[in-house]
Amino acid sequence: MAHKKAGGSTRNGRDSESKRLGVKIFGGQAIRAGNIIVRQRGTQFHPGFGVGIGKDHTLFAKVEGVVKFEVKGAFGRRYVSVVPA
């Protein structure tokens, strides 16, 4: 009568899949319309000239040009713009 005592349970053993967030195109780099610039949760970066924002707060280029990051305003908001080349 070979019996095996029940193994103990554990509270570990799971992890969420990474969401691949962050800046995809950096300042000074060339970009084409429709390309993703930043994937983010909330508005860490705000859209400036030539940049649109998706429903998940993804920033994307609306025009072709060069990416520019800048800090503006009294609250020190970070803006991303696309300067036409």
Swiss-Prot record:
Ranges that cross the membrane: none
Gene3D superfamilies per the UniProt record, alphabetical: 2.40.50.100
Listed GO MF terms: structural constituent of ribosome
Chain segments carrying region Disordered: 1-20
Alphabetical GO biological process terms: translation
Lineage: superkingdom: Bacteria
Residue ranges the record marks as coiled coil: none
InterPro entries hit by this protein: Ribosomal_bL27 (IPR001684), Ribosomal_bL27_CS (IPR018261)
An example Gene Ontology CC term for this record: cytosolic large ribosomal subunit
Keywords from the named record: Ribonucleoprotein, Ribosomal protein
UniProt family annotation: Belongs to the bacterial ribosomal protein bL27 family.
Name of protein: Large ribosomal subunit protein bL27
Organism for this UniProt entry: Azotobacter vinelandii (strain DJ / ATCC BAA-1303)
